[in-house]
Design a protein with these regions (language model features):
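Short, acidic/polar
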Residues: 22-35, 111-125, 180-187
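Active-site gating/metal-coordination segments in enzymes
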Residues: 85-132
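Beta/alpha (TIM)-barrel catalytic core signal, keyed to glycine-rich beta->alpha loops juxtaposed to Asp/Glu
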Residues: 27, 139-330
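N-terminal binding-site loop/beta-alpha segment at the start of enzyme catalytic domains
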Residues: 1-83, 87-91
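Short, well-ordered coil/turn segments that N-cap beta-strands
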Residues: 3-9, 39-41, 66-70, 128-132, ...
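Active-site mouth loops of central-metabolism enzymes
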Residues: 14-26, 100-116, 148
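Conserved, mostly hydrophobic/aromatic
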Residues: 11, 28, 43, 58, ...
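Active-site groove signature of glycoside hydrolases
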Residues: 123-147
Length: 330
């Protein structure tokens, strides 16, 4: 597999950017320390997460650790500007998600020059000399509307070329797209040479059909690694009320209620089922559930190895809740 990570569970850095709420600095740093103490050695972040706040906090939390002891991934496609602005920023469907982050303005830039600038900024905020894997962030419809294909064209002709060169020169280990949609990944596979993808919410217990149609089989064939972000689908599979970064609608809630009922009848924690389902596919290099509070990372690791009876998975399949093409945990 072209995405080689030290642990199959990583730490998703979005909560460090004050996602949904203003997280105190000591709590944010403690959540990273907890992840490290639990054995997690893969950390992901992005400039979008609080306009650089997540990167600053992650860098501070990891500063005392041997850089060779962990893998780090970050994202390009956005530049954090010096000027500040108030109110809701142009963040696509995630408009108010990081309203408690830093007030700096963020600008899209998927060019080769913008990619180099974004990496330089991230290295500085993270306080490190290298980033292992770089994801081109959000060249997709949920952020760019009907113009998303044009944006992806720029990204594949600019950022992808620059990152391929960096990989060849040994500056990074690999690159791919970091998106919430399957189609941009399929196009990137046809037109470029990515090492894998970070895809959020699209290979989960709740939503996996589209990924299984082409992306997952092709990734397996080419030895690419898929990092599954949002294995709890923004929290709805972990007892929360968010799906796709907003309050879940009635159709999604009804489907989750059926999943919960089946889980209860088999004495299964639905969170464990969600993590183990995503990890069961051979193309999945890691999952990165967000952990906004100390203790969550250790809990996620416990859930990922919890015993789940085969009868539960068979019941999901029989109810049509899991695709016949989806590998199930052993």
């Amino acid at each position: 597999m072209r995405i080689q990570l030290p642990t199959r569970q990583g730490f998703g850095g979005a909560p460090l950017g004050n996602m949904y709420r203003a997280i105190p600095e000591d709590e944010a740093l403690a959540s990273v320390a907890d992840a490290w103490g639990a054995g997690i050695r893969f950390f992901d972040t992005a400039a979008l997460y609080g306009a650089g706040l997540s990167e600053l906090r992650l860098g501070k939390a990891l500063a005392g650790h041997d850089r060779d002891a962990y893998a780090l991934s970050a994202k390009v496609g956005r530049i954090v500007l010096d000027e500040v602005e108030s109110g809701d920023r142009d963040l696509g469907e995630k408009g108010g998600l990081f309203e408690h982050g830093l007030p700096n303005r963020i600008a899209y830039d998927y060019t080769a020059d913008g990619t180099r600038r974004a990496i330089e900024q991230s290295l500085k905020r993270l306080g490190t000399d290298r980033i292992d894997y770089v994801w081109i962030h959000d060249p997709a419809k949920d952020f760019h509307g009907d113009a998303w294909r044009d944006v992806l064209d720029v990204a594949l002709g600019g950022a992808a070329v620059a990152l391929t060169r960096m990989r060849e020169e040994g500056m990074i280990k690999g690159w791919g797209l970091g998106v919430n949609r399957v189609e941009p990944c399929e196009i990137a596979l046809e037109r470029s040479d990515p090492d894998g993808f970070l895809i959020a919410g699209r290979y989960t217990l709740l939503d996996h059909e589209a990924a299984l149609a082409q992306l997952m089989p092709k990734a397996s064939e080419r030895g690419l690694g898929i990092v599954v972000g949002g294995p709890y689908n923004s929290g709805i599979l972990a007892g929360g009320e968010h799906y796709e970064y907003q309050i879940a609608g009635p159709e999604v809630r009804a489907r989750v209620d059926v999943l919960k009922a089946l889980a209860r009848s088999h004495q299964v924690d639905l969170r464990a089922a969600a993590l183990q389902f995503s990890l069961a596919h051979a193309a999945v290099a890691a999952v990165i559930p967000g952990a906004s509070r100390p203790g969550r990372s250790a809990e996620n690791l416990r859930l990922a190895s919890a015993q789940i009876p085969a009868a539960f998975w068979q019941a999901l399949r029989a109810a049509g809740l899991v695709s016949v093409d989806a590998p199930l945990p052993a």
